[in-house]
Amino acid sequence: MPIRALADIIINQIAAGEVIERPASVVKELVENALDAGAKRIEVATAGGGLNLIRVIDDGGGIPPEELPLAVARHCTSKLTSDIHDIRTLGFRGEALPSIGSVGRLTLRSRTPDADGGAEITVDGGKASAVKPVAANRGTTVEVRDLFFATPARLKFMKSERAEAAAITEVVKRIALAFPAVRFMLSGTDRTSTELPAVSADGDGLLRRLGQIIGKDFAENALPIDAEREGVFLTGYASIPSFTRGNALAQFAYVNGRPVRDKLIAGAIRGAYMDALPRDRHAVTALFISLDPALVDVNVHPAKADVRFRDPGLVRGLIVGAIRQALEGAGVRAATTGAAAMLQAFRVPEGPSRANGANDFTGRPFSGTERPRGGWSMELSPSRPLEDAFPPAANGFAEAQQVVFDIGSVVSADARAGTLEALSDLVGRPLGAARAQVHENYIVAQTEDSLVIVDQHAAHERLVYEALKDAIHSKPLPSQMLLMPEIVDLPEEDAERLCAHAEFLARLGFGVERFGPGAICVRETPSMLGEVDIAALIRDLADEIADNDTANSLKKRIDHIAATMACHGSIRSGRRLKPEEMNALLRQMEATPGSGTCNHGRPTYIELKLADIERLFGRR
């Protein structure tokens, strides 16, 4: 079969297969074109999930009549001249309009600010019409009907009308988040109309736009992010650890204003929240990365959803460091949604069940000598020392535990000082003054305007964990000498990498040295790890260093060991505390970054405002 050139219509349909995957892809391309044209008002209307109709209207600069034929021709653009690595616009290939016109019925109507009237061109299945004059407002209107009529096989892969409409909404919201000064309107027969009014482009305006898109709960539980490293700037907001979602769809990332779904950024977010989130929960973020266009390649994927950074390690480190710094600076803070969940749990049911509940209540006064079932206590009853809450370590952990952390000092030292402070002064603290212990597991505290309930085990677990981590990372870890050195055979390049990081590995308790070509001799291992498969661990370290030029896997592993030690070494549920011990625990929480969640990501306390309590009793 002879080689021959493909017809233009086939070329455009192939390009459409790469760029136009579904109706949401069309909306993305058209809205990006409108923004590149300087639009301040963008309207999107759809029908049939975008398959029957997509209409995008903007008030941008418009297209002159003589350039309309070029606008629907392949690889014709006003956004790129010669340098593919200096891209400062959302679009640059000149493929969107011809690709859309090859698989649907496209109408392009436009008018420039200085023109007396507008002009229109249509493309039906790849066939362009002549340009004709029409009445038009300033800006551009693009209308797409019968999407994929020219490639009916693609229709079989479309989802339901509702799903396609939802995908369009998601695309518009993701773009709108990066352009708060632009007004967006979304309407159609397949959806509820949505309007996102323009707001200022400063931090407060961005936070309002975040509230419009993600919800006001996020705005109330977000931490500002602002960092810079070697010419790469990071701004935005990240949620506190106790405000999470069940999936990562609420993680928004932008590179030079372009919405992206980048694995490196997603991984950096996971790393920043590594020991702060429960399993299968995800943080809510809106991160904006700004850098020289020459330092990032956006020409990786036809849909421009993926990017490639010249220095990925720099970007990852910037994200992880900035989020962790924000979390540490947040102090003691719980999600506002926790109180709402508590209020819902307390809500009295309507109907027969409420009446039955009322009949069950005897109304008998409390004599003061009885003790409610389940137990609560503020009495100074005999109690074993808090140090006894920590069982002796076993299997070689005792020495490491003694070296890195004086566990008995976490609460008991502050307990002595706490007794000197007046109760009225404690009420003014963020977590207030301890009033009672309920079920020998929960501390009830009072602040000036709220009631705080603390899970004593989860809270103390975080305190012990943070102290252990600080001790571990502030000085070299204790190591144990092997009776017989372990010889590990490795590829030559892996052995070379490990030797190059020998000093770093020594801080973590490893003693490694070369043992001939392609071999490593391991003489010491961290005593905290006990007995491990040394060969497997060394190979994993070599792979980690090859991937990231660091040994993060071991640091994570040690952090997990610290978490396990903290769990076993913290106050247990069912442990009765004295008032001074409870107050000392609250003061330590206030002084410890990230104490709003335990190291498994569960909340350590819930705050219920006095106004919410009054609503429960019908006072408001």
Curated annotation (Swiss-Prot):
GO molecular function: ATP binding; ATP hydrolysis activity; ATP-dependent DNA damage sensor activity; mismatched DNA binding
UniProt cross-references to SMART domains, sorted A to Z: DNA_mis_repair, MutL_C
Gene3D superfamilies: 3.30.230.10, Histidine kinase-like ATPase, C-terminal domain, MutL, C-terminal domain, dimerisation subdomain, MutL, C-terminal domain, regulatory subdomain
Keywords noted in UniProt: DNA damage, DNA repair
Pfam families: DNA_mis_repair, HATPase_c, MutL_C
Database matches in CDD domains: HATPase_MutL-MLH-PMS-like, MutL_Trans
Region span, Disordered: 353-375
InterPro entries linked: DNA_mismatch_repair_CS, DNA_mismatch_repair_MutL, DNA_mismatch_S5_2-like, HATPase_C_sf, MutL/Mlh/PMS, MutL/Mlh/Pms-like, MutL_C, MutL_C_dimsub
GO cellular component, as recorded: mismatch repair complex
Taxonomy, superkingdom: Bacteria
Any Gene Ontology biological process: mismatch repair
Family, per entry: Belongs to the DNA mismatch repair MutL/HexB family.
Function: This protein is involved in the repair of mismatches in DNA. It is required for dam-dependent methyl-directed DNA mismatch repair. May act as a 'molecular matchmaker', a protein that promotes the formation of a stable complex between two or more DNA-binding proteins in an ATP-dependent manner without itself being part of a final effector complex.
Name under which the protein is recorded: DNA mismatch repair protein MutL
Gene source species: Chelativorans sp. (strain BNC1)
Lineage: Bacteria, Pseudomonadati, Pseudomonadota, Alphaproteobacteria, Hyphomicrobiales
